[in-house]
Amino acid sequence: MERVTHFEIPSDNPEQSQKFYNEVFGWNYHQFGNEPYWLAFTGAKETPGIDGAIMKKKHPQQPMVCSISVKDINASIKKIESSGGQIVVPLMAIPGVGWLSYFKDPDGNIFGIMQDDKEAK
């Protein structure tokens, strides 16, 4: 069974959002690369839960997205399409991290799928 392992919170003002979630929940952040994208650390590794990110919104209606870790992203894409889902962001490499794609389920909810692969380029 594959699990939700990451979330992304889009924000018009990422710094304000970081401050809010830090003050309310104690989350800490680290900027990832040169993009306006900050990894959010929500607790100690031994504590149940998932980490995520706060990112600058790319468009006004950008939804919050949860991502699911998969073992074989190409097989997952085929299953999504054959089960009535739609790929909305094609497969792309996150260099040194893995492979990522976004899909819409039959109800219109958007999720990410991620396959770890340190060799991704």
Report each predicted region and the residues it spans.
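Core segments of cupin and vicinal oxygen chelate
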Residues: E2, E8-G49
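Vicinal oxygen chelate
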Residues: V4-D12, K57-E81, S83-K121
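Short acidic/glycine-enriched loop/turn segments that link adjacent beta-strands
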Residues: N34-Y37, P60-Q62, I94-W99
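A short linear hydrophobic-aromatic micro-motif
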Residues: N28, G52, I87-P90
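Acetyl-CoA-dependent GNAT
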Residues: G33, I54, D116-K118
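Short, charged/polar, Gly/Pro-enriched secondary-structure boundary elements
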Residues: E46-D51, G108-F111
